[in-house]
From Swiss-Prot:
This is Abhydrolase domain-containing protein lid-1. Belongs to the peptidase S33 family. ABHD4/ABHD5 subfamily. Disulfide bonds: none annotated. It comes from Caenorhabditis elegans. GO terms for biological process: lipid catabolic process; lipid homeostasis; phosphatidic acid biosynthetic process. Its main location: other. It is found in: Lipid droplet. One of its GO terms (molecular function) is lysophosphatidic acid acyltransferase activity. GO terms for cellular component: lipid droplet; mitochondrion. Residues 73-203 form the AB hydrolase-1 domain. Acts coordinately with atgl-1 within the lipolytic cascade to distribute stored energy to tissues during nutritional deprivation. The keyword Flavoprotein does not apply. The keyword Lipid metabolism applies.
Length: 360
């Protein structure tokens, strides 16, 4: 009896973890509602890339005014487990004279779940190759790349290999920059749930526990993270929770690649701080952190002090957590506009909104 019960439970969990056509349709619906809640008009398509004949899910918001003619565009890259709809509060503001694009990186979200190399360095280069194929297919000459968390790591890796295609890097609470240090040496203590997630990542794919919860996941995550509803309002209370659940339900090939890039508790095996100064000095970079984020801005400060004859800007948005772009979209969008419109020599000194460190 016990064996039969166990087999039934395992079968139920395996069924929960299957991404069906209905799951795909539900993901499309809740994503659409998140865009609709912010009144964002967008185009969605799948962009083919060479790597294992994959397709990169992409959304585009056209400029409100005359589009620039130099082939530049703004590109948002979401963090681990996130998707294009996380930036709905930013698209309209940023799409003034530039087309704004966002994509789910290959292996994540609504993109193909292609398998990457088990070698972390090779997997990183494969992801960079996919980004470059995507850029070519989109017909973009240069990109203002806005990467959040793991998206910031990917943006930096791309800039190392393709600096001539980067107009500016905007790295939002980027993951993977710091070298591993002892817990007692950390300047900022991470939230308990972040420490838990980092610990789990050492043994399982990061979002495996959520997949095991099956259809109960949205309700459980809502109990654990009620703040997400405030940051990412949809037309219905469960939209953001269903979105994150369905995004991470398919075969987790991207998560597996990420896990291969990490040490226990989420440190990067190849921290970007050791490599960042290899990026061409003509590529400007703006770091944006939330004052309440658990990510340490120390690596950005180190880069600022050592990256001579290059533009490095550090902004800390007061009252914001790691999702700076959602916690204070007005301040975030203003920073992005300053970068895109070339107001780099005059960073804001309005400390009621943000604290700024700047080197030029």
């Amino acid at each position: 009896m016990a064996i039969a019960t166990t087999k039934t439970a395992l079968t139920t969990i395996m069924n929960w973890m299957t991404f069906t056509d209905d799951s795909k349709e539900q993901l499309k619906i809740v994503e659409g509602r998140l865009f609709q809640s912010c009144e964002v008009s967008y185009e969605a398509k799948y962009v083919p890339v060479r790597f294992k004949r994959g397709e990169v899910y992409t959304v585009t918001v056209r400029p409100r005014e005359a589009e620039n003619l130099n082939g530049e565009a703004i590109v948002f890259i979401p963090g681990l487990g996130a998707g294009v709809a996380m930036f709905t509060a930013n698209f309209n503001s940023c799409a003034k004279n530039h087309a704004v694009h966002s994509f789910d990186p290959l292996g994540f979200g609504r993109s193909s779940r292609s398998r990457f190399s088990d070698d972390n360095a090779i997997a990183e280069l494969e992801m960079v190759e996919v980004m470059e194929d995507w850029r070519k297919a989109m017909g973009i000459e240069k990109m203002y790349i806005i990467g959040h968390a793991f998206g910031g790591y990917l943006a930096s890796a791309y800039a190392l290999e393709n600096p001539s295609r980067v107009a500016h890097l905007i790295l939002v609470d980027p993951w993977g920059f710091a070298e591993k240090v002892e817990t007692t040496e950390k300047l900022i203590k991470p939230y308990a749930w972040m420490s838990f997630l980092g610990g789990v990542a050492g043994y399982f794919n990061p979002f495996s526990p959520m997949r095991w919860m099956g259809p109960y996941a949205p309700a459980i995550v809502k109990k654990l993270r009620p703040d997400l509803l405030l940051r990412f309002p949809g037309l219905h209370d469960y939209d953001i929770y269903k979105y994150v659940y369905y995004l991470n339900l398919p075969n987790p090939t991207g998560e597996t690649a990420f896990m291969n890039m990490t040490l226990p508790v989420g440190w990067a095996k190849r921290p970007m701080i050791k490599r960042f100064n290899g990026i061409d000095k003509n590529v400007g970079v703006s770091f944006i952190y939330g004052s309440k984020s658990w990510i340490d801005p120390g690596p950005a400060i180190d880069i600022q002090s050592t990256r001579e004859n290059a533009y490095v800007d550090i902004k800390i948005v007061r009252g914001a957590g790691t999702h700076v772009y959602a916690d204070d979209p007005a301040a975030f969008n203003e920073i992005v506009s300053d970068v895109v419109e070339g107001r780099l020599s005059n960073p804001s000194n309005d400390f009621e909104i943000e604290e700024c460190c700047h080197s030029d």
